[in-house]
Structures are given as C-alpha cells and as structure tokens.
C-alpha cells in the first residue's frame, strides 16, 4: 500500500483523503483491525469512542463504519470515513481482500489475488499503471514476535496495535449480545 504513495503527487493526495475501506475474510478480523490501526498511525487519523456507527444491526454486522479525523499542520481537521467490511470466503493473501483509499474522485486500491498458487497484491492508482507484486509476508504471529520480541520493539507495531485495539473496543460496545 505504502509503495503507491512514493511519488510526491500521490503523497499530496493523502492530505485530502476522505475514505478508507478494508475488506477482509471472515476469519481475518484481527488482521483488518491491525491494518486499520497501522493506517491510522501512518496517516495521523484519530477517533473518539463515540464516533462508531454500525452499518448493519442484526447479528454480526457486515461492516463497521468509523468516523475519523485527520489534523493538518495548521490544526484544521477534516473527516475521514473508515469502513471495515467482512467479505466472502474467497482466498486472499493474509486474509485481506482489498484496501481502498479515496481522495475525492481518486482511488488507490490494493487487491489481494492468488495467481498460479502464488499470493499477490494488485496495486491500482490513478497516477501509475496497474502492477502486481508477490506477497512475501510472514504469518501474523511471526510478525508480532519479530516486532515486539527481543531485539524488536517496533514503535509502528505498538502504535498499530493501540489504534486497532481502540477500534475493537469501540466495535465491541455495539456487538455485545442482547438479552
């Protein structure tokens, strides 16, 4: 995802970002929350626990909508919508089907695919031709041990976990069983 914003013109669109959508496999909620937390940290997005709304109210929701705020250097805030979407059971690398960042009419998308048995991510941007990159990642548990274990101490991972946990706690308030 980050590689789509290496060019200065693409980086500039992040200052007008208004939507982030993360579609994930049914068993990959933790990965979706961690990715959302990482994006919140990198894009300096925040949310209060009162800014959570459910898009579906019966049983387990199909999506969760969070109203986030981005602060610019002048202290001006703007709204950014974060939507976590529970997708289908189709295979995708690391359980994330698609991530879309929208800024006005511009859309930057990373879509997980499996081509010939090799997990890949297709990247689409209005500023560059589409490209496919192989996924050479490790399991979530291995990443956590590497980032937080002896010799790790990755501050980005701690920040992503903190933001993801806030989202999970906010969602949990709305997902408790009735009765």
Predicted segments with their positions:
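Long, compositionally biased intrinsically disordered terminal regions
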Residues: 35, 41-48, 57-179
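ATP/pyrophosphate-binding catalytic subdomain of soluble kinases
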Residues: 1-68
């Amino acid at each position: 995802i980050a590689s789509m914003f290496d060019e200065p013109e693409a980086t500039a669109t992040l200052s007008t970002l208004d939507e982030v959508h993360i579609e994930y496999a049914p068993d990959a909620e933790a990965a979706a929350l961690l990715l959302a937390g990482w994006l919140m940290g990198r894009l300096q997005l925040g949310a209060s626990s009162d800014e959570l709304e459910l898009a579906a109210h019966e049983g387990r929701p199909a999506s969760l909508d969070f109203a986030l705020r981005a602060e610019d250097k002048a202290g001006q805030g703007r709204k950014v919508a974060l939507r976590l979407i529970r997708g289908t059971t189709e295979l995708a690398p690391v359980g994330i089907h698609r991530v879309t960042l929208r800024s006005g009419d511009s859309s930057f998308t990373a879509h997980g695919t499996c081509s010939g048995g090799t997990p890949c991510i297709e990247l689409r941007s209005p500023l560059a031709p589409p490209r496919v990159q192989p996924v050479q990642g490790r399991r979530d548990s291995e990443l956590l041990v590497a980032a937080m274990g002896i010799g790790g101490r990755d501050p980005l991972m701690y920040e992503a976990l903190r933001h993801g946990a806030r989202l999970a706690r906010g969602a949990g308030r709305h997902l408790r069983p009735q009765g």
